[in-house]
């Protein structure tokens, strides 16, 4: 396994797609093109919330701005969700329907593998919900406010590495890619 830096790719790889798949493909293609056509893979990950219509989604890392601050991203997410929940409660008082006014959310990862010049895609999803406040010190990103369905009483930031890896979106996508490689490498 070789990292992009080992191939001389040290710059930030562009992420201009509007979907996780597009960004994952863009990153893998960039590595492929700048590493002499070497087999490679890249991923993109995002957090999708029902109440915010899928946001932050593809913009998860820079949701609160280009500086990519995890803390600012969480602050913005919690503020936006609270505002939408308030709007939904007012609408319900007037008898209006408020579809998707829940804290349901999911992490998604899409991996693009370029093998022998052919592109293959693998996806992993971790379903859950967003808590009302940060809890836990582990993990990174949105982990302190994400409660996975498999562990409904704690945030992902409170899980051990083994617990998180067993259920994580990225782990699921990597296992799908590994299974595909195992199956196709034997042919």
Go through the PLM ranges and name each one:
Residues 1-187:
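Anionic-ligand binding patches
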